[in-house]
Amino acid sequence: MDLSNIDSWVFDLDNTLYSPEEEIFSQIDKKMTEFIISKFNVDEEEAFNIQKKYFLEYGTTLSGLMKRKNIDPDEFLEFVHDINLESLKPNNKLTSIIEKLPGDKFVFTNGSKKHAENVIQQLQMNKVFE
C-alpha cells in the first residue's frame, strides 16, 4: 500500500495509543464522580447518577456540566486527568510503525493538553508527534 501521498496523520489518544486494559479511563471515571461530589455536595451515588445522566443526555459528562451547571471545562479537565499513569508502558513496535509513516503526526483527544502530553511522555512517544 502506497502511503507516500498522505501528509498528515491524526491519532486518537485514549485507548488507542495504549490498550483499554490499562484501566486509565476507570481512574478518570472515578475522578469525575469525585469532582461532582466536591462541587455539588452530593453523595457518591447521586454524583454517579448525575455523571451518567449528563453523559447520556449531552454526549459527555463535561458537556452536561457546562450546559446545566456552568462548570469551567479547564477546572474539570485538570481535576479528572490528575491520575496515575505508571501502568502505561512504551510500545516500541507501535512507536516504530508510527515513526515510519510519512508526514506529520498529531494526537487528538477530548482530554486536556496536559493529559495528552503526560500520556505521550509516559509512552515515550514525545518525538513522534507534533
Predicted regions and their residues:
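N-terminal helical cap/lid subdomain that shapes the substrate entry/recognition surface
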Residues: 2-11, 16-93, 103, 114
